[in-house]
Amino acid sequence: MNRISPPAARRNRAFGAIRWVWTAPTTLIGHATARLLGCRNPQRIGGQATNAWLFRLPAGRFKGWRAVAIGHVIIVEPAFLAEHGRWLLAHELSHARQHDWLGPTYLPAHAVLLFLSTVMFSFRPVAKFSPWHAYNPMERVLICVPVDVIADPPPPQGALAESVLRAFGLTG
C-alpha cells in the first residue's frame, strides 16, 4: 500500500497555546509511561509538521516492545528503531499529528480501533500485519505515514517520500 501523504506545516502560532493545552493530558501520560519503563534523557525530534519527545527503552529490556506514541511522546525499543529508522519515526510522528486533532480522545479512540482491528483480524488475517494494525484506520488510512511503510517494505522513495521526511524533520 505505502500511501504516504505530506503533512501540512503547523503555521498558525496563535493556536499553539490551545494545542498545547489540548494535548497536555495525553502527553503527560506519555512522559509518565516512559519514566515508569525506565527511559531517561529524551531527545526532541520533529519538524514543521509536528514534534515529539523520543524516549529509548533501556537496552535489553522490553525486547517485545516496538514503538508507541502517547501524545507527543514516542517510546521505542532501540533495536526496532535501528531496523526501521526514520520511517518508524515518521509513522510515530504521524500519530502525534493525530493527537493534535483528537487531544484527550486520542487514546480511547485508538484503543477502540485497536480492539476492533484485533477482532476483525481473528476472522480474516492480513499477511505481514499485526492484529492491532491490520484493520485500524488510525494506523493505515487516517495517517500521513501508514504502518505499511514498516510492515510491508521497501519503504517509499522519491520526491514525495523526501518531502514527507523533511516535513517531520527527518532528512539527512
PLM feature spans:
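Metalloprotease/metallohydrolase-associated module, dominated by Zn2+-dependent proteases
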Residues: 2-65, 78, 107-172
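Short charge-dense sequence patches
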Residues: 37-41, 91-97
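Short pre-active-site segment immediately N-terminal to the catalytic Zn-binding motif
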Residues: 64-67, 73-89, 100, 133
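Catalytic Zn2+-binding segment of zinc metalloproteases
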Residues: 93-111
